[in-house]
Curated annotation (Swiss-Prot):
Residue ranges, compositional bias (Polar residues): 18-29
A Pfam family hit: C_Hendra
Region (Disordered): 16-42
Protein name per the record: Protein C
InterPro entries per the UniProt record, alphabetical: C_Hendra (IPR031812)
Lineage: Viruses, Riboviria, Orthornavirae, Negarnaviricota, Haploviricotina
Domain of life: Viruses
């Protein structure tokens, strides 16, 4: 550490006679004085400890709340949930169809590459739904082809 740093920490030196008078003027410390160092508690640093059954009880409570909310909400929300599920099924079906098509192209000798996918994206051959799914489909096909090459299928 540089000397300047230590000098800043040290109070300026006083003559010995001044120090003695200052010490004699101080009141003696009593035992009731609070400690100068504040003890830090565990809670200020770490999150509270969760007891064994607490987490399970909390998730059960959340589940009950969710079921209660579903009962209280109007019928439209359940139909919206059904619509979302149906859309997910459609997406799965479209993804499956895309994967089948890409695999068929590979079997016929057309190598499915990133540049081919980019070309398909630039032309208007894909529907918006297919455009959203083409890259996941491409990745699946790559994985399948890699797996097939490893196992000589």
């Amino acid at each position: 550490m540089p000397l300047k740093f230590w000098k800043r920490l040290m109070p300026p030196k006083k003559k010995s006679s001044e120090t003695l008078t200052l010490l004699s003027n101080q009141e003696p410390l009593s035992m009731q004085d609070p400690p100068l160092v504040r003890s830090s508690t565990r809670s200020s640093i770490y999150p509270p400890v969760i007891k064994k059954g607490e987490h399970r009880a909390k998730t059960k409570r959340n589940q009950e709340l969710a079921e209660q909310l579903l009962k209280e909400l109007p019928h439209e929300t359940t139909s919206i949930a059904n619509l979302v599920q149906r859309n997910n099924r459609d997406l799965d079906y479209n993804l499956e169809q895309l994967v089948r098509t890409l695999l068929q192209m590979e079997k016929e000798g057309t190598h499915v590459t990133e540049s081919l996918i980019n070309t398909l994206m630039e032309t208007d051959t894909l529907t918006p739904k297919e455009q959203a799914l083409i890259w996941p489909a491409y990745n699946l096909v790559r994985q399948m082809m890699h797996h097939a090459a490893l196992h000589h299928i």
